């Protein structure tokens, strides 16, 4: 299935059902009083994370989603049925952003996690609600309020512990094949990897971590060159980054300059991403003799002024990959528990406080004094609809 990590959709919550104006009609009860019921609340729209999904492609073909409207109230104090909520299933790691305000509604990072993105309209009130000692035959009702409408931008960011960085043909896909059962395409030309790949590494029994491979970066990637820049966001949630460096590039380029270009692109794209723990992994060591290899590695580390961890591997021959995997699992296990993603400012929905405000308004204007046998005159009042802003 095609990998799609962005989609724009429109969600519409259901309108609230309107209240009803009705009076009790029953034999031997000449003055039955009001019995109009309230309407039902409109259905809301939710996003729910499911780990069995890994793409947003479904939302490219179906962009409009609407929840059910609440039913109107009826006589005999019958309350309208509430509209059914609409639940949209998305992959774990999805972020929802309001297109108009650009505010983040939240991230779904756990299987089964649910998030409200459009709140259903509030139900209208029937004329029973307006009965008081001074208004025994109320002909007022309120209409249901409209449901919220939002344009949402959905962004999928893969959840992985380790992310791979490097120039095209540095050997990232070969490395992920050597340490996991993932089978990304490998070939001798640049940009063989076109979409991110995930692999699960099991260095020890009962211990594992997830590794992510993205398309290679080139100079100018932060400004739109190449493919990798659009996938850099998938590394934002990684705990550690592996900078894969080809020790002997086939095109004759300088590995040191390539490494510097990658670091520069990271800093341009996201200083937060550039500040993550980053290990230098020098690949394709099988192409050099041992003496020449040692000298070349020392020169690279010296020129880069690299102060972090440095590892030499041959992903093709699986030399050094197992030891590196063990180092990674030990490092990840030693890290403190991952902090929850920073919560954005609390999102306000249209009708969050409507219920409380409506009740306060009723209490101010009417006394709560009910009598089922209050007298009323059918011709005293006309039906009055109260519109709520």
From Swiss-Prot:
Uppermost EC category: hydrolase
Superkingdom, natural source: Bacteria
User: Where in or outside the cell is it found?
Assistant: Cytoplasm
Name the PROSITE patterns for this protein.
Answer: G_OBG, GTP1_OBG, OBG
Q: Where does GTP bind?
A: 166-173, 191-195, 213-216, 283-286, 314-316
Q: Where is the Obg domain?
A: 1-159
The GO cellular component terms are: cytoplasm
Which Gene3D superfamilies does this UniProt record tie to the protein?
GTP1/OBG domain (2.70.210.12), P-loop containing nucleotide triphosphate hydrolases (3.40.50.300)
Q: Which UniProt keywords apply?
A: Cytoplasm, GTP-binding, Hydrolase, Magnesium, Metal-binding, Nucleotide-binding
This chain's function reads: An essential GTPase which binds GTP, GDP and possibly (p)ppGpp with moderate affinity, with high nucleotide exchange rates and a fairly low GTP hydrolysis rate. Plays a role in control of the cell cycle, stress response, ribosome biogenesis and in those bacteria that undergo differentiation, in morphogenesis control.
> What PANTHER family does the record point to?
DEVELOPMENTALLY REGULATED GTP-BINDING PROTEIN-RELATED (PTHR11702), MITOCHONDRIAL RIBOSOME-ASSOCIATED GTPASE 2 (PTHR11702:SF31)
Q: Which family does the UniProt entry place this protein in?
A: Belongs to the TRAFAC class OBG-HflX-like GTPase superfamily. OBG GTPase family.
For this entry, the protein name equals GTPase Obg
Organism source for this protein?
Shewanella woodyi (strain ATCC 51908 / MS32)
